[in-house]
Amino acid sequence: VPLPPVREKVRVTASFPYRYYLNYCTYSYSMAFWDWEQWEKEIDRMALQGINMPLMAVYSQYAVWQNTLRRLNFSEDDIRKFLPGAGYEAWWLMGNLEGFGGPVTPEFIARQTDLQQKMLKRMRELGMKPVFQGFYGMVPNALKEKFPDARIKDQGIWGTYQRPAFLDPTDPLFDKLAAIYYEEQK
């Protein structure tokens, strides 16, 4: 159904300079299988509502982590064991599980990356400044085998899921890994 015509210009000024939108769970529970057509409409609605800082952390994380782990000489099998399936990204990025619902295919990662690039382009065209996931120390449990002297903490189980490990931020490996992660995120 087409929208009715706008009879007169409407202008509303926001009270706050930063207007953040979305969270990890929304991406995983509601938007995990959205395509570009759905996202384009959502991004346009964001702009109409004055959103200027949308969360843009989920789709690109597959490629960021895949490439980061490749640079640390992880096997493709170990990388696939770390990346979760679609719909589980929120729990993964919040440090609750690793690999569940996977493995994801290279084609899936490429599609997610392409979708994210389109989303970013549109958001930036509309003056938004997307918010990305930062590196906070969550790492695959398999990192302990690659770097046995690093201070990597086992986080145990969450429900019935194996949680990712946590790299101590005071360990020298933290800065090295963060630098690789941010290079890959560009």
Question: Which residues are covered by each model-predicted region?
Answer:
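Aromatic-lined carbohydrate-binding surfaces of glycoside hydrolases
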Residues: 6-186
